[in-house]
Amino acid sequence: MKHSDFDIVVIGAGHAGAEAAHAAARMGMRTALVSLSERDIGVMSCNPAIGGLGKGHLVREIDALDGVMGRVADKAGIQFRLLNRRKGPAVQGPRAQADRKLYRLAMQEEMRNRPGLTIVEGEVTDFRMQGDRVAGVVLADGSEIASQAVILTSGTFLRGIIHIGDVSRPGGRMGDRPSVPLAERLDGFALPMGRLKTGTPPRLDGRTIDWSILERQDGDDDPVLFSFLSKGAYARQIACGITHTNAQTHEIIRKNLSRSAMYGGHIEGVGPRYCPSIEDKIVRFADKDSHQIFLEPEGLEDHTVYPNGISTSLPVDVQEDYVRSIRGLEQVEILQPGYAIEYDYVDPRALTSQLSLPNVPGLYLAGQINGTTGYEEAAAQGMVAGLNAATAILGHEPVPFSRANSYIGVMIDDLTTRGVAEPYRMFTSRAEFRLSLRADNADQRLTPLGLELGCVGDERRDVFARKAEKLATASALLDQSSFSPKEIATAGITISQDGNRRNGFAVLAFPDVRFDDLVPLIPELADTDAETRAQVERDALYANYIARQERDVEAMKRDEALVIPIDFNFSALDGLSNELKQKLTSARPENIAQAGRVEGMTPAALALILARLRRGDRARSA
């Protein structure tokens, strides 16, 4: 049996797969999204939350390009909080507690309603090949789907093994079988692969928790949503609870460390440093006598509670003992035990910045298969792969994500240049240009790019145009004004009486000056809405820093323009250490800027590469 032909086939309908398929379809591609079950599209396999520090920036950027995660999270959000609110706007991150069922249903609706996107139920066991090129997929029932490109978003399913204590069994996640035939097929491509692990905590019955003695955590009164299209929260808002481990909890865990899958030697994969298991916390932070736990309800009509902070691979009986030693959980019932899951991943240095494999034309990888952890990182990669697979088919240039224009660009560059030694997670600290890569201006940075690509719909175009007009009007009023220090002082604003005239934007850049303070000086600003006021304030706050940062951005762009040929032989370059030759060969940097970020790179080594490139240019032009 043969299915209809498609332009792009996406394998897997998790966060990466859904975003990849939707992006490809928005680009006009006939797209097939293959999932074991349509009901599994959009399942939140781990924590019931979207966003956070760095992660919230990724969701905003996905939304700016008309991706779906932000809209779906807003529809399913049952508690919204802006993290790092006390710090500067550049490092604040929106986060939402989500109703698992609402999220899954909203994502399925997005997939079903997208023109050009077809959902196919089945298991992919092999690739269709035309020579050395991937040209579609083969399903378990023997049927085939032909395509010009395939995007693999297998999550934790490639040779996945679930560990609970000393009991191990195959599984892609609890209740689902792993993908072994596809993993074996990837072996045939001789890709650099390894094993990683992640974990999840036991799920608790909220009806058996004593909420009355726990600290209550409410959401923000004025919730900050993800999508630039959303007007307000859709679902009823709820509170979460906070409790802590204690000395008794730690003693139970310490006594049973040898029974943990991780410490008992059953797991070879490396886990995420920034989301450690409770066993890891007890060992690595032995001086701490308590760890915070957030009790997060999984839905409005669901009694299940996710105890964020105690993921584990201890045996079930130990899980019951240590959980019931925690305040408020003395009588709790465990609905599903926590577990660790180990799975295959591909060294992302084998990928191009488009997330394609140079040695396997037609194949793109996105999500946890590339060594990342987290829904948001997966979704962002899915969109990158979907857009780039489409532009390649259309004969267009690759999508120019870079460290200067997006957190997406930072992540892709980190992965493809530096690789991973542990599951990669996004943080604001990874972005050197984070002052200009704020969550609030993601649309200003990326929606024009989306309009140029053709992946942005009419509604977003119109919303963006209205916002841009409001910002331009307010900015023009500020820029065109001019005030003496005395005039500024009469408005109650304290600045140096140095005799220098300043425009409104320069005044707004002073500490503690707010947009409202300038209304007496520029009455036309009185009609400016709250969102525009806040955005202009942030632009002014960082204006001087960003101006200085632009010099670094320009230097990076010059280095990015110095392209390194894909067949450049680093091993033949005298003067480089063998270690650096190996790292450069693995990373295959596409330009001098990327080469400079390879671990162990020195100015002298970079000069050698530049000299060889220039000799090659002269030889070609001779």
Curated annotation (Swiss-Prot):
NCBIfam families linked: mnmG_gidA
Assigned keywords, A-Z: Cytoplasm, FAD, Flavoprotein, NAD, tRNA processing
Subunit record text: Homodimer. Heterotetramer of two MnmE and two MnmG subunits.
GO biological process per UniProt: tRNA methylation; tRNA wobble uridine modification
Pfam families reported in the protein's UniProt record: GIDA (PF01134), GIDA_C_1st (PF21680), SAM_GIDA_C (PF13932)
Record-stated family: Belongs to the MnmG family.
GO molecular function, one term: flavin adenine dinucleotide binding
Keyword Transmembrane helix annotated: no
General function of this protein: NAD-binding protein involved in the addition of a carboxymethylaminomethyl (cmnm) group at the wobble position (U34) of certain tRNAs, forming tRNA-cmnm(5)s(2)U34.
Domain of life (superkingdom): Bacteria
Protein name: tRNA uridine 5-carboxymethylaminomethyl modification enzyme MnmG
Binding residue positions for FAD: G12, A13, G14, H15, A16, G17, V124, S179, Q368
Localization of this protein: Cytoplasm
Record InterPro entries: FAD/NAD-bd_sf, GIDA_C_N, MnmG, MnmG-rel, MnmG-rel_CS, MnmG_C, MnmG_C_subdom, MnmG_C_subdom_sf
Keyword NAD applies: yes
Protein residues bound to NAD(+): 271-285
Cofactors required: FAD
Organism of provenance: Ruegeria pomeroyi (strain ATCC 700808 / DSM 15171 / DSS-3) (Silicibacter pomeroyi)
